[in-house]
């Protein structure tokens, strides 16, 4: 059973390497019509203005 899980994880990793951009979000991906950035946590000089995919926030500079 553990060997099957290891093989599945390895094949999934290989799949992600063959097709970049699938299943992951770039930190520099824009949101809110290009006015924000998708990040796991906003910087102190930014505020949360929405949600990106999964557990990412749409962060925008404070005015």
Swiss-Prot record:
Keywords: Antibiotic, Antimicrobial, Defensin, Disulfide bond, Secreted, Signal. It is found in: Secreted. Residues 1-23 form the signal peptide. GO terms for cellular component: extracellular region. Transmembrane segments: none annotated. The keyword Secreted applies. Disulfide bonds join 31-58, 38-52, 42-59. One of its GO terms (biological process) is defense response to bacterium. Expressed in testis, epididymis (caput, corpus and cauda), kidney and neonatal and adult brain. It holds the Pfam family Defensin_beta_2. The keyword Iron does not apply. InterPro entries: Beta_defensin_dom. Belongs to the beta-defensin family. Has antibacterial activity. This is Beta-defensin 35.
